[in-house]
């Protein structure tokens, strides 16, 4: 049995060192896969921004048309009628100060997304040490601090993902599973790239997308030609 190192080397040899159209890259990524599990497919964008400057930070959310292959577990922190709305919309966990206390005392994080109403943020804000490092802190910019908790829950369940630049200017987001039909992965990736293009800060000068790569958990990275998608996003 070949070692993983030899397997990834064999996979890399089947990928040419050139940018591929998404429609060609996705089937190639699926062809060279060797892992025995259903890998996550990720898209990484290298942007021509300086994240040290607040006016060049790229951040946003987008609902991927075909989801991510798994339903996210959603926690809603609210009170009164908003709790009932969240439950009706399909939230997995719903509570108020009791949930805040549980997270603070136990470091509880058995969920994928947290939605809060504005009135609860005074308490939720104290959970920064637990939620912050995991990217779970509710934020108005990503639609997770809202009075419309029902819509927020439905969007997250439908495949809403957040994207933001890290300190090196990279955006790294999952776009589905390797088992997805190729056209669904192409749709999801195109939707993400389009959203990132539309989120370009006015302060960013020069070439915006400097590189784009599609990869799976264990597989090689494939360079993507985003020219056509960028042009369509601006039209």
Curated annotation (Swiss-Prot):
Taxonomic placement: Bacteria, Pseudomonadati, Acidobacteriota, Terriglobia, Terriglobales
Entry's family note: Belongs to the universal ribosomal protein uL1 family.
Pfam families: Ribosomal_L1 (PF00687)
MF-aspect GO terms: rRNA binding; structural constituent of ribosome; tRNA binding
Name used for this protein in its record: Large ribosomal subunit protein uL1
Keywords from the UniProt entry: Repressor, Ribonucleoprotein, Ribosomal protein, RNA-binding, rRNA-binding, Translation regulation, tRNA-binding
Example GO biological process: regulation of translation
Oligomer status and interactors: Part of the 50S ribosomal subunit.
GO CC annotation terms, alphabetical: large ribosomal subunit
């Amino acid at each position: 049995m070949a070692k993983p190192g030899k397997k990834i080397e064999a996979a890399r040899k089947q990928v040419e060192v050139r940018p591929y159209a998404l429609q060609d890259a996705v089937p190639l990524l699926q062809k060279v896969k060797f892992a025995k599990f259903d890998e996550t497919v990720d898209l990484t964008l290298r942007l021509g921004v300086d994240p040290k400057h607040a006016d060049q930070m790229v951040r946003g959310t987008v609902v991927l048309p075909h989801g991510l292959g798994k339903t996210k577990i959603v926690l809603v922190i609210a009170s009164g009628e908003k709790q009932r709305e969240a439950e009706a919309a399909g939230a997995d966990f719903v509570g108020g100060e009791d949930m805040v206390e549980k997270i603070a005392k136990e470091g509880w994080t058995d969920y994928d997304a947290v939605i809060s109403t504005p009135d609860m943020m005074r308490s939720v804000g104290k959970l920064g040490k637990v939620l912050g490092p995991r990217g779970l802190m509710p934020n108005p910019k990503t639609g997770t601090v809202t009075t419309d908790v029902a819509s927020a829950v439905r969007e997250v369940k439908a495949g809403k993902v957040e994207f933001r630049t890290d300190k090196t200017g990279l955006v790294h987001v999952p776009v589905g599973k390797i088992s997805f039909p190729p056209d669904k992965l192409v749709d999801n990736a195109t939707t993400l790239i389009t959203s990132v293009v539309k989120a370009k800060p006015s302060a960013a000068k020069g070439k915006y997308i400097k590189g784009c790569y599609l990869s799976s958990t264990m597989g090689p990275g494939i360079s993507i030609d985003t020219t056509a998608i960028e042009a369509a996003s601006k039209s």
